From Swiss-Prot:
Belongs to the RMDN family. This is Regulator of microtubule dynamics protein 2. Residues 121-131 have a biased composition (Basic residues). One of its GO terms (molecular function) is microtubule binding. Interacts with microtubules. InterPro entries: RMD1-3_a_helical_rpt, TPR-like_helical_dom_sf. The keyword Magnesium does not apply. GO terms for cellular component: cytosol; Golgi apparatus; membrane; mitochondrion; mitotic spindle pole; spindle microtubule.
Length: 410
């Protein structure tokens, strides 16, 4: 199974059993400029403590405990405010870096009398294609498109500049396919990283005809996840993630015993959580964990599920003291997992599909390093280097494996 859909997923699904480990995601992610965190200030709990009257505060153990908790919350509030401000500043800097070159280009073209030719985003390209092939009325929008218009649809203009692969020239005639033929063709196209967009557009061309078919629905949800993966624009990522999640939910409603529906709904929940506030992140975390476990019960031989669970366990096992303290203070319990549990899932992935992904080998090696088994770690690092570098996830894993090998040789 292609493994590029795993990219960035775990960053959005660290909520854990009670949504707690999503706080860990927040703690790590605030230093990365790609994601904007609009968390509500964690001041409400502090205010509740502040409103308590403690007449015997200095003499009562209970009063001292409340004072201590209040001070803890005040520290967390200040920390949250500081990190949020840092993230907002980094997002503004990133925006300026992207905007200034385009502004310079526009000015040069204006004075030079040139005509600017921009690359077309995949979302605009797909819609333009449909406009030339199928005449649709203004009322024919699907429910997923309507949802995207509620706040997640992007401004589809030719001025958007993207840096990812574009599809080859598209035919102006849509070939009508039977459902089984369509699904086979879409699955086959998706096995090639460079053909994922074509697979997505093929499914979109037939969504009005097969929108009630479960096998079609979960594949279309998966395809929206692929487009999330390919997109570099934050707005487009939001658009694809939200529509995909809606489709995944519809698929589960129609077929609650279909493991693929639960799998890809969980994946899309993780993607959506990238752009949500703290409360919704926790909710997405609940959904991810719940549907991942259901999918494992229904698809016990699916390697992707164990890889995702391994990533989850590995991240939770590495929570720092302050992350655990924050989780306990805010939610009353601490998420728990071990490196051994993570390793078990990564090895299960390898057992089900040898050479599943470079990333799986990389995380297996990391587990062995932490367990004090450098020889096993080297073994899996070397196995990782035997695999081809195809996706961005592969490139990141390859770089990390090289660092690990250098460290193990010391």
């Amino acid at each position: 199974m292609p493994h590029s859909t795993n990219k960035e997923l775990i960053l959005g699904i660290m909520a854990g059993t009670a949504g707690i480990s999503l706080l860990a995601f927040w703690y790590h992610k605030v230093l990365k400029p790609r994601t904007t965190m609009n968390f509500p200030k964690l001041l409400s709990l502090g205010k509740k403590f502040g409103s308590l009257t403690l007449p015997e505060e200095s003499h009562s153990a209970q009063g001292a405990s409340v004072v201590f908790q209040r001070r803890q919350l005040q520290i967390l509030e200040k920390l949250n405010e500081l990190l949020t401000n840092m993230e907002e500043l980094k997002e503004e800097i990133r925006f300026l870096k992207e905007t200034i070159p385009k502004l310079e280009e526009c000015i040069q073209d204006e004075f030079g009398g040139k005509v600017t030719v921009h690359k077309i985003s995949p979302q605009h390209r797909a819609r333009k294609k449909k406009g030339t092939t199928v005449q649709r009325s203004a009322t024919s929008n699907s429910s997923e498109e309507a949802e995207s218009e509620g706040g997640y649809i992007t401004a589809n203009t030719d001025t958007e500049e993207q840096n990812f692969p574009f599809p080859k020239a598209l035919n102006t005639h849509i070939e009508e396919l039977k459902l089984d033929v369509l699904l086979q063709k879409a699955d086959h196209l998706r096995t090639n990283e460079s053909h994922k967009m074509e697979s997505f557009e093929l499914l979109c061309d037939h969504k009005e005809k097969f929108s009630e078919e479960t096998e079609f629905l979960w594949r279309l949800a998966r395809a929206y996840g692929d487009m999330y993966d390919l997109s570099t624009s934050t707005q487009e990522k939001k658009h694809y993630a939200n529509i995909g999640k809606t489709l995944g939910e519809r698929a589960i409603t129609r077929a609650p015993m279909n493991g693929h529906c639960h799998l890809w709904y969980a994946v899309l929940c993780g993607y959506v959580s990238e752009f949500e506030g703290l409360q919704n992140k926790i909710n997405c975390g609940h959904l991810f964990k719940k549907h991942l476990e259901i999918a494992i019960q229904l698809l016990p031989e699916e390697p992707l599920l164990y890889y995702l669970k391994g990533r989850y366990c590995y991240t939770v096992s590495r929570l720092s003291w302050i992350e655990k303290k924050m989780a306990a203070t805010l939610f009353g319990e601490i998420p728990y997992s071990t490196v051994h549990e993570a390793l078990h899932n990564f090895l299960k992935t390898e057992e089900l599909q040898p050479g599943y992904s470079m990333s799986n080998y990389m995380y297996t090696a990391k587990c062995y390093v932490e367990l004090g088994e450098p020889q096993e770690a080297c073994k899996f690092c070397n196995l990782a280097l035997l695999l081809p570098v195809v996706t961005k996830e592969d490139k990141d894993a390859h770089k990390e494996v090289k660092k690990m090998i250098s460290s193990l040789k010391r």
